[in-house]
UniProtKB/Swiss-Prot annotation:
The keyword Ribosomal protein applies. Keywords: Ribonucleoprotein, Ribosomal protein, RNA-binding, rRNA-binding. It comes from Thioalkalivibrio sulfidiphilus (strain HL-EbGR7). This is Small ribosomal subunit protein uS4. SUPFAM superfamilies: Alpha-L RNA-binding motif. Residues 96-157 form the S4 RNA-binding domain.
Length: 206
């Protein structure tokens, strides 16, 4: 199954919230009516059942991190076998994806752009090039832009903007060297509050 490459607004309208797929500081314009679902009858957004709410939350989480269904289900299975809260484990596994860490460190303006940088071998981990977007970054790992890619204007622009917005507590970034340290796995309290991972757990627990 191919990745969705259509309008970002359509995905956000489907979920009824801005998924921030357009990058830092670029919220959806006013033409994107988040209170209406896409399609001819979008103004008649149906009241969802419990199952519908669970499904929508799963789709929202998948789309935020850009993960396909089979891979997302595998993340859930892994999370359910780990100690602690399955929902928190799931979010932490998604946050530890290399493409997400590249995005969090500001090397990519969006997760999609970060994924492209990884696949094009523009990123290295602990001095070694890694081109697998799903690679699980470990605490203390050093993630950096490879020397040959440091002149890319899009990376420079993204870093400048990210520095203005600030970096998450669990990463430490040296913008001049274009490298960062993944200091620790983020706690649930440090992650977006608008995600209700318990609905995803309920969905897959059936």
């Amino acid at each position: 199954m191919a990745r969705y490459i259509g309008p970002k607004c359509k995905l956000s309208r489907r979920e009824g919230t801005d998924l921030f797929l357009k990058g830092r500081g670029r919220s959806l314009d006013t033409k994107c009516k988040l209170d209406k679902a896409p399609g001819q009858h979008g103004d008649r957004r149906a009241r969802l059942s419990d199952y519908g709410l669970q499904l929508r939350e799963k789709q929202k989480l998948r789309r935020i991190y850009g993960v396909l269904e089979r891979q997302f289900r595998n993340y859930y299975k892994t999370a359910s076998r780990m100690k602690g809260s399955t929902g928190e484990n799931l979010l932490q596994l998604l946050e530890r994806r290399l493409d997400n860490v590249v995005y969090r460190m500001g090397f990519g303006a969006t997760r999609a752009e970060a994924r492209q940088l990884v696949s094009h071998k523009a990123i290295q981990v602990n001095g070694q090039a890694v081109n697998i977007a799903s690679y699980q970054v470990q605490p203390s790992d050093v993630v950096a832009v490879r020397e040959k890619a440091k002149k890319q204007v899009r990376i420079q622009d993204s870093l400048t903007l990210a520095e203005q917005f600030g970096f998450p507590e669990w990463v430490e970034v040296d913008t001049k060297k274009m490298e960062g340290v993944f200091k620790s796995i983020p706690e649930r309290s440090e992650l977006p509050a608008e995600i209700n991972e318990s609905l995803v757990v309920e969905l897959y627990s059936k």
